[in-house]
Amino acid sequence: MSKHAAVESDEHVAERTAEAARQVERLTRWHDDFPTPGVRFADLTPVFADAEGFRSVIESLAACAPDADLVAGVDARGFLLGAGVAATLGTGVLAVRKGGKLPPPVISREYSLEYGSAALEIPGNGVELRGRRVLLLDDVLATGGTLAAAAHLFVEAGAQVVAAAVVLELEFLGGRARQGDYPLTSILRLP
C-alpha cells in the first residue's frame, strides 16, 4: 500500500466518484469538428483549472488503486493527473511520453490512431520498474489504443498494472474492449 493512502469503503469511493463525475460534467467544454471535421473534442482544461473540480478528480482517481507504488500519467494531460494522484498516495510518478521525447534507451510501443499511428515510451533504465505496482492514468478513453499501449510498456518492463483510470470515457468508441486484465475506472462515461 502507498505510504499515505487509506483503504476506503466501496460506498465512500462511489460517493467520491459521483461527486467527481458531477464536476467533470459541469466543467467540460465541448468543441464540435475539432481537431478535424466530425470529431467532438472534450476539453478538460476547465476541470483542471477549477480547484474543487481538480481536487475531486484527483481524490477519485487516487481511490482506484490505494496499493499502487507508482503512478504513471500518459502524455500530456495524464501528467497533471499523475502528479496530483501520486502526491495524494505518497508514491512516485512517471511520465509516459510520446515517441522521441526521451533519451535512449527506451521501451517503446506503437499504436494506431483514427488518423495514423503514434508511439509511447518510458525509460529503459534509470527507473527500476520490475515488480512495481502501477496505477495508469489518462484523461480520455476513446478508441483505447493509447491506454493499451501504455499498459504494454509497463508489462514489458516487468511491472504490474494494478489499475487504470480515466476522467472521461467515450463508450461509443469501444476503447474499454482493448484493455487488459486490470480494473479500469472512468469517472464519467458517455454512451
From Swiss-Prot:
Disulfide bonds: none annotated. Gene3D superfamilies: 3.40.50.2020. Transmembrane segments: none annotated. Keywords: Cytoplasm, Glycosyltransferase, Purine salvage, Transferase. It holds the Pfam family Pribosyltran. NCBIfam families: PRK02304.1-5. Homodimer. InterPro entries: Ade_phspho_trans, PRibTrfase_dom, PRTase-like, UPRTase/APRTase. The gene is apt. Belongs to the purine/pyrimidine phosphoribosyltransferase family. Pathway: Purine metabolism; AMP biosynthesis via salvage pathway; AMP from adenine: step 1/1. It comes from Nocardia farcinica (strain IFM 10152). PANTHER family: ADENINE PHOSPHORIBOSYLTRANSFERASE. This is Adenine phosphoribosyltransferase. The lineage of its organism: Bacteria, Bacillati, Actinomycetota, Actinomycetes, Mycobacteriales. Catalyzes a salvage reaction resulting in the formation of AMP, that is energically less costly than de novo synthesis. SUPFAM superfamilies: PRTase-like. One of its GO terms (cellular component) is cytoplasm. It catalyses: AMP + diphosphate = 5-phospho-alpha-D-ribose 1-diphosphate + adenine. GO terms for biological process: adenine salvage; AMP salvage; purine ribonucleoside salvage.
